[in-house]
Structures are given as structure tokens and as C-alpha cells.
Amino acid sequence: MNIQDLGSIGELIAALATLLTLGYLAIQLKQNTSALRSQTFQQSSMDMSLTANSVSSDGELAKIIIKAENGIASLKSDEKLRFHFWMLVAVRRFEAIYIQALYGSIEKERIEGFETSILSLLSNVGNEWWKLTKSAFSSDFTVYADGKINSGKYKVSVHPGASVE
């Protein structure tokens, strides 16, 4: 065996080591992607829960939302302000989830429940607010939300399972 043969064996070993390293990195990348998606879902779930909790823990806010079913004009000025900013937070949180789904950080199937919650709100009690405020959101989100709202799929007034009658 001459030096050229030893050099060829060395190149083969280096190529195999490179392939093993690439395989290892691919496995690590897949695990990291899975962990990122899980973490994104967990954070999204917590954010949406905070939105719901603000209503369940604040009787006055709950009354404002129920009153808003009769239109924004039925609200007093301080109620309009509270309703506006609560809606802004709720919809902004969902917009962030929608964007994460576009980026692939969360699977679209995982956001269906969040989607139903917010779009039910925007289709009914929050519809007037949405028409007045949607310019504050990204244009692609606005097109998406309007398409979903106009589908007529979201019939409940505030949230699936919540009766405010």
C-alpha cells in the first residue's frame, strides 16, 4: 500500500465522518423544531387563556362584552375604551398565533380552536369593532379574518359553549 492509497482511505473516512455528522445534525434539527412547535403552542395557549381569564375574573368586563352585543353605541365612553382594548389584545394575540402558523412554528391544525374562539367573537359581538379597527392589523391577517368571518361558519355570539342570554 502506497501513500496515495492511504490518502484515499483517509478521504473515505473523512467523507463517512461528514455524513455521520450531517445525519446527527439533521436529527438535532428535527428535535429542535419539534420542541419549538411545542413551546409555541404552549405559549399561544397561555396567551389565549389570559384573554379568557380577563373576562372570567372581571365581572365588569363581562358585562361590557354582553352589553356590546347591542352595538358599540350602547356602551358608555369608559366601557367603549375597555371593550376596545380588550378586543385589541384578544385579536392581536390571535394574529400572532396566525403569523406563527404562517412561519411554520405551529401547525395550522393546532390553531383551529383559537381560530374558532376569536372568529366567533369577530363575527358577532365584535363585528362592529372589527370593521372600525381592522386597519390596525396586518393586511394578510385582515384578508384571512374577513374571509373566515364572511364564510358564515361562526354563529355563536361570544364563544362556543358560552350562553349569554
Predicted regions and their residues:
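Membrane-embedded hydrophobic alpha-helical segments
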Residues: 1-39
